[in-house]
């Protein structure tokens, strides 16, 4: 009994201890679950806060558009108050350059950060690659800006010109998609557009249409991070689109002006098909009206951002695919409207403006030389996505995001250019142009000869400078060219070449067809 009696308290003790132990375990487990939930909520909050702090992105790209047409770049004839205001609210680059003369290669470079000898898009895409039976996305193997932003949680929308293949279907992370079946513009009214994977005739003035869809996309996605690629097909400046009468709101005013900002220089012998447009007031007025039409669209986009309270949290970039000569140096058009193909400044120079209130220096004019291939690393660094830049293929672009914040960084003043059989390197004072299986090569002292009329390539006193620049050019392409797409060394091209006869070993690359 004594043992029994003595055992009873022990049993009670063991039972109580077990109960306490079980209760303790339950409490600890509950506390741990609570802590995990709290940590998850806090982490989620931090992630949401981080996502909210990452700005929306609006990239506005125009087509065949020289920076010289804008008031903020000194033009006194053409009305561009909204783009001028954007420049006042951000940083304008006075020396920004395209790396090619035509639409598809420059757009491919802008979105990938790669040169044509790396991405394979050497000339503009013909219809068969855009909506025909052989259509495919020429950028599908690369990490592009929209694809990276999509993967980072952005909703991505395209309104306007694509011209990079398989136009009928949304590409590269875009979910909102309205575009043109082809790259070239035969006009701005009653044109075919692609919407909901179908082609239809659109009566709306195309510049207004792209703006309207840009606004629609912003409003639909105002509560989440978004990326809008607003790619106008104006001002364009070429073909039948310039023969079309002015119909936008600048018609009456512009038909009375003479636009002295368009040079009336003697047409140079290398003009291929537009030399007689120099000084043609009908063409000049139409081009000017289309520039101002784009400016109206920019104003509407900016007003929408402000009305929705999104302006401070939206990075806006304004640029063009490549420049255009409106008579400068005796040419009209781009570097593909000459024979031989050329690399003159009027085809390279483009507008470039970055703006985000409170984040980017306002009213700054930055004179450093930058190229369109520099935008890729700059944008991704600015957004905190530098770790998403692929290590391969190596990209030639440099990050100038600190400059947007007002900081000084080391910077080599040079840019590179590649258009089929033409490669060039440009510094502040010099430009060296080399041609593959064609002549002449060219050397210009730009500070003395800004119109690039006096070729010094055979001048003995500049041989050392020529050799230095040639070495720079050769080293650049030796470092970055991908043998698969390097047409100077037997590579392929995703586009038909204008200079195909010079590249007998190069053929049009077409991938295996895919089911759609």
Model-identified regions with their sequence ranges:
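Long, internal low-complexity/basic segments
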Residues: 18-19, 50-55, 62, 66-67, ...
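Beta-strand elements within well-structured catalytic alpha/beta cores of enzymes
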Residues: 54-66, 85-86, 110, 149, ...
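Active-site segment of extracytoplasmic enzymes that catalyze sulfate/phosphate-ester chemistry
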Residues: 59-62, 66-157, 176-190, 381
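Short, solvent-exposed turn/loop segments enriched in Gly/Ser/Thr/Pro and often Arg
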Residues: 72-77, 91-115, 122, 127, ...
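Substrate-binding rim/cap in mid-to-C-terminal beta-strand-loop elements of soluble/periplasmic
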Residues: 111, 183-200, 270-278, 299-303, ...
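Formylglycine-dependent
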Residues: 122-151, 163-255, 260-288, 491-494, ...
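C-terminal cap/loop subdomain of S1 sulfatases and analogous C-terminal strand-loop tails that border
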Residues: 163, 170, 175-176, 181-184, ...
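Histidine-centered active-site microenvironments of extracellular/periplasmic hydrolases
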Residues: 170-180, 238-247, 303-362, 368-371
